[in-house]
């Protein structure tokens, strides 16, 4: 029944959901850009793990729903509980889970790391992996922006705002373990080297 519904939807929209094999072929090997942000007193950020940015990591051909491509890649690598939306225009962070953002369409200027962090422009095909505690906020309206978010299996979603970065929040962040897979490249992905647990 679901396959029939899928075929009808694909016929109506002209775009489809890729198979796991098709999605794998759309992954582009990229060197990560790393950004380690310090606690600024309001946004805790992560003391051990840097934000990892893969530029143009996913090819998004017209034949497939771009968000479905990214969902398939993240899901195949064990990152789930996904959503489709934009990026909030207020500064926030998560204390009990890491998060990955895949840009399915459009572009946006995003402040990462709190008010003393960095403003980065993210575009279609980019993937950003945010360690627990990393502040993030879209700072300007974004035309056509569609983001796919997902989380590793361990962890719990929460959404404190700056000023709520208590000592308890910092303790929670410090205890979120490194994920076992890179959301784009799997077990051997660059994230695994970038996020070697430096707490030991």
Residue ranges and their predicted role:
Residues 58, 104-105, 114-116, 134:
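Short, flexible loop/turn elements at secondary-structure junctions
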Residues 110-111, 118-120, 137-138:
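Short, solvent-exposed loop/turn segments at secondary-structure junctions
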Residues 139-200:
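Double-stranded beta-helix
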Residues 122-142, 151:
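Conserved metal-binding segment of the jelly-roll/cupin
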Residues 116-118, 144:
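Short, surface-exposed beta-strand-loop junctions and turns on beta-sheet-rich folds
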Residues 3-91, 192-200:
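A short, N-terminal "cap"/entry segment at the start of jelly-roll beta-barrel domains
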Residues 94-111, 129:
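Short, conserved beta-strand element in jelly-roll/cupin
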Residues 86-100, 115-116, 123:
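A short beta-loop-beta micro-motif enriched in histidine and acidic residues
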